Amino acid sequence: MTTNNSTLLDTIQQGFRITVGATASLVETLQDPQKRQGTFQDLQQEWDQRASQWAQKGTTTETEARQYVDQLLAQWRQSLPNPLSKTTATGSNNIIDFATAKRELDRLTEEIATLKGELAQDKPGTEG
């Protein structure tokens, strides 16, 4: 038998023993009213304790998550340009870029008109 098989059998055997032990404890608890009451009180107390721990952890996690989201939103807002600010460097760059683009567009329009004129002169049958 290999080590893996041995480990698997040990795990199965332990699971079986846990099941038998839990069943025996349940039967004993159901047969003895005093033990049943004590067991239920213990379970209730443990549940209350766990619920309190989970609520505390949930509060902490919620606070941390909120801070993280607020931080991300603040960074995002800072990265956006301010459309109301007229004195920002970005605003002045946009004006320069627009003016440059307008000049380039005018130049290209003139070039297209010139090329159209040249094509019209070079067409066969349009000689004058």
Curated annotation (Swiss-Prot):
<keyword id="KW-0793">Thylakoid</keyword>
<protein>
    <recommendedName>
        <fullName>Uncharacterized thylakoid-associated protein sll0982</fullName>
    </recommendedName>
</protein>
<keyword id="KW-0472">Membrane</keyword>
<feature type="coiled-coil region">
    <location>
        <begin position="95"/>
        <end position="123"/>
    </location>
</feature>
<dbReference type="GO" id="GO:0031676">
    <property type="term" value="C:plasma membrane-derived thylakoid membrane"/>
</dbReference>
<keyword id="KW-0175">Coiled coil</keyword>
